[in-house]
Amino acid sequence: MQVFDSWAGELSPSTFKQFSEPFLAHISKHLPIRLKELGLDQVPMIVFPKGANQVLDSVCNLGYHVVGLDWLIEPSEAVKIRGDRPVVFQGNADPGVLYGTEKSISETVEQMVSGFGGGKKGWIANLGHGRSNIMLLNPPSV
């Protein structure tokens, strides 16, 4: 289950703490309880507060299994902020790279892999956001 806060990056840290964080925390705390009450299996929970890199430390404490990252934070910086908390990152290739050459896409992926530590644990390769509407009108050729 993925929770998007597409405007999180437009909020100051204090405004995020007041108007977004409580609701994101409520979902991560109460959804597993409700699923259990309904006799349903637990599901992995992902939060994607787009652009809220200034509050990544707080987001890593919200109780989600996975935190989605946009392309505006370096993976290595996100890893430093996360520390040893058991949070997996998802992202964070710039969607615009899809307009590039095969070589530029490969270079972007290699940088992302390296930034997340080069291993196979603790992150999920993905774009740092969905495709733009422009891509629907002018799809990438690679």
Question: Model-flagged regions — what are they?
Answer:
Residues 1-142:
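Active-site loop segments of alpha/beta catalytic cores
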